[in-house]
C-alpha cells in the first residue's frame, strides 16, 4: 500500500531520515502554530502537521503507517494487526495488552513535541495604574532553546542516538512477583529518562538538556480597570518546548497597592469626606478628590454623618463593559477637640436657643490645663 499523506504534509519523501522529519516539523510548526499564525485554517493545518510528525517520528508507528496507513499507526493494522504474542505491526505483545488492563495502556511517543512550561510573574501596580491602565516592562529568566545545539542536547556535529535500553520507547517493562503471579508493568527508562534517546557527546553549553537559562524582557499592556488577583496571559512567553514543541505561556498576576485616600470594589471607588458640624448643619460646597481630579460637591444643610453621595462617572472603568463606574463619598462629621472661649460661648448660646439649657461644659482640672499649655508651646 502506498501511504504518503503524512510525508506529504511534512513535504518529505518516504525515505526521509528522522533528522529530516524533525527539521521539517520545526519549520512548519513555526509557520502554522496558532500562537504565531492567526489566519483562518492555521490551527487545523498545525494539527495535521503534528499528527503526521507524531506518527513518523516513532519507528514502530511509522512502520505500521507505511504498511497499513493511518489505521495501522493507531493500532488497527488489518490482517496483520494482532501479529502474535511477540508483538506485531498493530498491537504490541500479549504483556502490553495485559498491562493496559492494569493502568499501563499505550505509551506516548517520547520524542513527540511537547509545549514548554508556563511561568508566573507578579506585577505591582499603584492604585491609579490599576484604574487607568499602564504599560510595564517585565524582566525575568526563562529556559530557551539552546542556540549551540538547536535544542538537540548533542554536541554540534553529532546527534542523539536511539536509547539502547528501551529501544527508543522511553519506557521499559519490569516484572514483579504478586499474589496473582508474575505481573509486568511499564516504567520510565532509567537510562534516557523517558526521552527514547541517548546523548553520547552532550552539548557543552546546555550539558545535554537542549535548553539554557536566559534573561528575557517583555512589555505588557495592563488594561484599565484591573484588580488584584487577575491574570494576563502572554502566549509563547514561557519556557521553551521539548522536541520542537511550542513555548509555554507567561501569566502576569496583578497586585494593586492600596491608596492612602481611596478604596475600591470593582468599578466603584469609595472616599470618606471629613466635614465640620457647622458645614453639616448649614450646608456647604466642598472640593472632593477623585482619581480624575478634584470636583465640587454640594453638602446640603442638615447632612448627617454616614450620608453617602454619588459622583457619577468618577470611578474606575469596567474591565469588560467599557463604561465608567462611580465614586461614593461618605460624610463623616468631625467633632472639634479644642475650643476657645468665644467658640464655647457661641455653642452654649446655640444650645440655649435650641432648648438645651442643661448643657454643662466639663471643667478642666489642673493637669489638663497644664497639658493644654504644653501642647500650645
From Swiss-Prot:
Disulfide bonds: none annotated. Residues 5-69 form the J domain. It comes from Streptococcus thermophilus (strain ATCC BAA-250 / LMG 18311). One of its GO terms (molecular function) is ATP binding. Zn(2+) 1 binds at residues 146, 149, 203, 206. Zn(2+) 2 binds at residues 163, 166, 189, 192. GO terms for biological process: chaperone cofactor-dependent protein refolding; DNA replication; protein refolding; response to heat. This is Chaperone protein DnaJ. It is found in: Cytoplasm. Keywords: Chaperone, Cytoplasm, DNA replication, Metal-binding, Repeat, Stress response, Zinc, Zinc-finger. Homodimer. Its main location: cytoplasm. Binds 2 Zn(2+) ions per monomer. InterPro entries: DnaJ, DnaJ_C, DnaJ_domain, DnaJ_domain_CS, HSP40/DnaJ_pept-bd, HSP_DnaJ_Cys-rich_dom, HSP_DnaJ_Cys-rich_dom_sf, J_dom_sf. HAMAP family: DnaJ. Participates actively in the response to hyperosmotic and heat shock by preventing the aggregation of stress-denatured proteins and by disaggregating proteins, also in an autonomous, DnaK-independent fashion. Unfolded proteins bind initially to DnaJ; upon interaction with the DnaJ-bound protein, DnaK hydrolyzes its bound ATP, resulting in the formation of a stable complex. GrpE releases ADP from DnaK; ATP binding to DnaK triggers the release of the substrate protein, thus completing the reaction cycle. Gene3D superfamilies: DnaJ domain, Heat shock protein DnaJ, cysteine-rich domain, Urease metallochaperone UreE, N-terminal domain. CXXCXGXG motif repeats lie at residues 146-153, 163-170, 189-196, 203-210. The J domain is necessary and sufficient to stimulate DnaK ATPase activity. Zinc center 1 plays an important role in the autonomous, DnaK-independent chaperone activity of DnaJ. Zinc center 2 is essential for interaction with DnaK and for DnaJ activity. A zinc finger (CR-type) spans 133-215. It comes from the Bacteria. The gene is dnaJ. Belongs to the DnaJ family.
Amino acid at each position: 500500500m502506498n501511504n504518503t499523506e503524512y510525508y506529504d504534509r511534512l513535504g518529505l519523501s518516504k525515505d526521509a531520515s528522522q533528522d529530516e522529519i524533525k527539521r521539517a516539523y520545526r519549520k512548519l510548526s513555526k509557520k502554522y502554530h496558532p500562537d504565531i499564525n492567526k489566519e483562518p485554517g492555521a490551527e487545523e493545518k498545525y494539527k495535521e502537521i503534528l499528527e503526521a510528525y507524531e506518527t513518523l517520528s516513532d519507528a514502530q508507528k511509522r512502520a505500521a503507517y507505511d504498511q497499513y496507513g493511518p489505521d495501522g499507526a493507531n493500532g488497527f493494522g488489518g490482517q496483520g494487526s494482532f501479529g502474535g504474542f511477540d508483538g506485531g505491526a498493530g498491537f504490541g505483545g500479549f504483556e502490553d495488552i495485559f498491562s493496559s488492563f492494569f493502568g499501563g495502556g499505550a505509551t506516548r511517543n517520547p520524542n513527540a513535541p511537547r509545549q514548554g512550561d508556563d511561568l508566573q510573574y507578579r506585577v505591582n501596580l499603584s492604585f491609579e495604574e490599576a484604574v487607568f491602565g499602564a504599560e510595564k516592562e517585565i524582566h525575568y529568566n526563562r529556559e530557551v532553546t539552546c542556540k549551540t545545539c538547536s535544542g538537540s542536547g548533542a554536541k554540534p556535529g553529532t546527534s542523539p542516538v536511539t536509547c539502547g535500553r528501551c529501544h527508543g520507547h522511553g519506557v521499559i517493562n519490569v516484572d514483579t512477583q504478586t499474589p496473582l503471579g508474575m505481573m509486568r508493568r511499564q516504567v520510565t527508562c532509567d537510562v534516557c529518562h523517558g526521552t527514547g534517546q541517548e546523548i553520547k557527546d552532550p552539548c557543552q553549553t546546555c550539558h545535554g538538556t537542549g535548553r539554557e537559562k536566559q534573561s528575557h524582557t517583555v512589555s505588557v499592556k495592563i488594561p484599565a480597570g484591573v484588580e488584584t488577583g487577575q491574570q494576563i496571559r502572554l502566549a509563547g512567553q514561557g519556557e521553551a518546548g521539548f522536541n520542537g514543541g511550542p513555548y509555554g505561556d507567561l501569566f502576569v498576576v496583578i497586585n494593586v497597592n492600596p491608596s492612602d485616600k481611596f478604596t475600591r470594589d470593582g468599578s466603584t471607588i469609595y472616599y470618606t469626606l471629613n466635614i465640620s458640624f457647622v458645614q453639616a448643619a448649614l450646608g456647604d460646597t466642598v472640593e472632593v478628590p477623585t482619581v480624575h481630579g478634584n470636583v465640587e460637591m454640594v453638602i446640603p444643610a442638615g447632612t448627617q454623618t454616614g450620608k453617602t453621595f454619588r459622583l457619577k462617572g468618577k470611578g474606575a472603568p469596567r474591565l469588560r463593559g467599557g463604561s465608567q463606574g462611580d465614586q461614593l463619598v461618605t460624610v463623616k462629621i468631625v467633632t472639634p477637640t479644642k475650643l476657645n472661649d468665644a467658640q464655647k460661648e457661641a455653642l452654649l448660646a446655640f444650645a440655649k436657643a435650641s432648648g438645651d439649657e442643661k448643657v454643662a461644659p466639663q471643667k478642666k482640672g489642673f493637669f489638663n490645663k497644664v497639658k493644654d499649655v504644653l501642647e500650645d508651646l
